[in-house]
Design a protein with these regions (language model features):
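Non-transmembrane "mature" sequence context
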Residues: 1-134
Length: 134
């Protein structure tokens, strides 16, 4: 019964336009970057796009696209990072403190690792493992 109700709730209401995956991911990335206090320059490095593109993304005049696979996948990882931090700590200040603190298991500050693809994947995997223990 719950699955049926969930499917019904997920359907667009009559007279409304369905929201694209690109619009949802774009909004989630911008919101995550804001809540994690990432500058547009940092967001550009994380997504592998130019600073101008990151600026347009934050202004709402650029949308992520699954056709641009690299930025799409990095955006998904950034949202996973945010969701994991939120699940583990529940508020921004604790997440900021964790990101800025040296982590022995990662051998660095997570904030320093996130701008590289390898570092972002390592941090997300670390957080996924931490969430799995909850």
């Amino acid at each position: 019964m719950r699955a049926k109700a969930a499917r019904a709730a997920a359907r667009p209401k009559p007279g409304t336009k369905p929201v694209s995956d690109a619009a949802v991911l774009t909004k989630a990335v911008v919101r995550a970057a804001q809540l994690l206090s990432f500058s547009q320059r940092e967001l550009a490095r994380i997504l592998g796009v130019s600073e101008a593109t990151a600026s347009r993304l934050c202004a709402g005049s650029y949308q992520l696209s699954a056709a641009r696979m690299k930025e799409w996948e990095l955006a998904l990882l950034l949202v996973r990072l945010f969701r994991s931090l939120d699940a583990l700590w529940g508020h921004e200040e604790a997440a900021h403190t964790w990101l800025a603190s040296h982590n022995v298991a990662l051998a660095a500050r997570p904030l320093d690792l996130v701008p590289s693809i390898e570092g972002l994947v390592r941090v997300v995997n670390y957080l996924d493992n931490a969430r799995g223990r909850l």
